């Protein structure tokens, strides 16, 4: 279309003298038209940009079919993996236009159902709906391939709806139900499962009564079997088996009181970091207390020894000084005529360092009588500072005599 416009513009171009305006104009228009048409052509391709374009709003569904007079079916959404339902118009099956009705793959699928889309073989055989669908499919084989395919799809949908009631848990096969995990029996340890939050979360042991219906050509036998199995849902479970019921408010980490089949009581799991004896801070506290008590006892004994030794030293020194004083007093007050005085002098009575290395030889001391002492003019001094004897027992010694005696003793 735009090429015709360009051709018309080129034919209608007016050639002015010196200015070919028509040629320039149609070149510019052609470039503009190409720039507009190229993105539209790219959007129609199967590239990744096609999915980013906004989709047109869907048309509202028809509420009434004008041909058959029956209410029209609501079309399936675009994102649904299930194929749209086939409408029956005037007793004939009408397939979608985009789908071929006579494919060799579809004909093979009509004769042999696909494995894995339905339930396990035991469940497929036991379902009454499958029996009806198989009978209808056998009648539809003679009718035609489109009707066979529609009936097979309908039978598969019935199987998906009746999956829970016809599931055989003894085979421990996984189910196709969302948020539902069925486990087979694993042993006697199922009742001792660890539960962090008792009564709210965690798997528990559940027994489900399942009814399995088996359809035979002549007779129909219904058997009810109780199969213990473990059911995990989103978080809220319930125990139905009275033998393995766990109370909701009691933690499962406690030791189980019910013995197992062997008669042995199963021990609960030990928590990591839990010690069987005292804690670390208790051991440290006891050790420090013992050390302090022992140190106090040692200090008391040392102080007692020191006090006893110092008391003995003081007592011994005082006794020695007393003995020295008594001895010096005795030496000064007792002057026999034929005896030489001892090594301790009057001036060394209270000094232990001044001792004579040998006995001093004294010359003959004149004998003084009481008259001579009283008649001698001078001062008299007592040399004893302790407990004085009576005046009759004391002997007064003149100072001149003491000084003379000091010079006469060679020490």
From Swiss-Prot:
Positions of transmembrane segments: 283-303
Q: Which GO terms describe its biological process?
A: cell adhesion; negative regulation of cell-matrix adhesion; negative regulation of wound healing; regulation of polarized epithelial cell differentiation
Extent of Low complexity compositional bias:
115-146, 247-263
Identify this protein by name.
Adherens junction-associated protein 1
Q: Which residues lie on this side of the membrane: Cytoplasmic?
A: 304-411
Q: How does it sit in the membrane?
A: Single-pass type I membrane protein
Per the record, its GO cellular-component terms are:
adherens junction; apical plasma membrane; basolateral plasma membrane; cell surface; cell-cell contact zone; cytoplasmic side of plasma membrane; plasma membrane
All ranges on the Extracellular side of the membrane: 44-282
**Subunit details for this protein?**
Forms a complex with CDH1 and CTNNB1; interacts directly with CTNNB1. Interacts with AP1M2. Interacts with isoform 2 of BSG/CD147.
Give the region (Targeting signals) as residue ranges.
Answer: 303-411
Signal peptide bounds:
1-43
Q: What does this protein do?
A: Plays a role in cell adhesion and cell migration.
Please give the superkingdom of this protein's source. Answer: Eukaryota
- Molecular function via GO: beta-catenin binding; protein domain specific binding; protein-containing complex binding
According to UniProt, the tissues expressing it are described as:
Expressed in uterus and pancreas (at protein level).
Annotated organism of origin? Homo sapiens (Human)
Subcellular localization? Basolateral cell membrane; Apical cell membrane; Cell junction, Adherens junction
Q: Which lineage do the record's taxonomy fields give for this organism?
A: Eukaryota, Metazoa, Chordata, Craniata, Vertebrata
